């Protein structure tokens, strides 16, 4: 499971972070949890799983791996934020100008010298 709170990038951008937070809020409003990755251990434990193991699966992207720049930073993460733009604007979470700037700043992380980091969490356990 992913965890949007684990998103780090360069160049840093407060407005990009605000755009990401819109995704977190919209998912919460729809009954989801965009920060669920950090909660896997307690969720599995509360569900009576045993032998629980949770491990981070970090995705780190920079110029040295153009396939990941295109496939993850641009076509997955930034595209997801772009996809919630209209709803975030209509619910007054962010202005059109701000979300456009946030998306542009996320795209900047996919250009020369930029970096992008995100963590997924894998949880396993057994049930009696």
List the predicted regions and their residue ranges.
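Residue-level preference for alpha-helix termini and adjacent loops
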Residues: 8, 93, 115-117
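A generic alpha-helix surface/boundary motif
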Residues: 21, 38, 82-83, 119
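Short glycine-rich loop/turn motifs that provide flexible caps or phosphate-binding loops at active sites
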Residues: 36, 91, 124
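Short coil/turn segments at secondary-structure boundaries
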Residues: 38-40, 97-100, 117-122
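Core SAM-dependent methyltransferase catalytic element
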Residues: 47-52, 67-71, 111-128
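C-terminal helical/coil "lid" or tail adjacent to the Rossmann-like core of SAM-dependent
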Residues: 53-113
